């Protein structure tokens, strides 16, 4: 007999939603702290990925607390460029995404949020994978330029 308590829940490989246009669903995540920090003292980056096109925007942050202001600027920029509105945001449960200020802002703007369950990065796989891809690309570029390993 199998011990049910020790089994992990299965996560579907395919998304359970289908977007039909740009900005319908934005995946986001913060990566960091990264060492060494940049010359401008930035230790984190935040990614925004459009589920429809997979277009990705990356912003560098000194602190995670900058995420809300960056999101607001990102929202204005992409909505103006596409003449569409962000409808859903999928993220982890980091404090920058669960703050009262962020929740209130999303509610005012009509943005629904999908927050993944705790300790389940699989549920935010698009953003998690994109962060890993970006870090792999950076490491590859640094290695090809024969930069010291501390970079």
Label each PLM-derived region with a short phrase.
Residues 1-151:
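Anionic group-binding determinants
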């Amino acid at each position: 007999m199998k011990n049910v308590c020790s089994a992990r829940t299965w996560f579907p490989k395919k998304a359970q939603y289908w977007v039909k246009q740009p900005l319908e669903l934005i995946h986001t995540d913060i990566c960091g702290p990264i060492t060494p920090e940049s010359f401008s003292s930035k230790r984190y980056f935040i990614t925004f990925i459009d589920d429809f096109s997979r277009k990705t925007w990356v912003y560098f942050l000194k602190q995670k607390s900058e995420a809300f202001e960056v999101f607001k600027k990102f929202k204005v920029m992409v909505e103006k460029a596409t003449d569409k509105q962000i409808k859903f945001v999928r993220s982890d449960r980091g404090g920058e995404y669960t703050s009262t200020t962020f929740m209130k802002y999303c509610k005012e703007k009509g943005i629904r949020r999908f927050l993944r369950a705790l300790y389940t990065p699989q549920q935010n796989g698009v953003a998690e994978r994109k962060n890993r891809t970006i870090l792999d690309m950076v490491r590859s570029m640094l290695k090809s330029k024969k930069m010291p390993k501390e970079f």
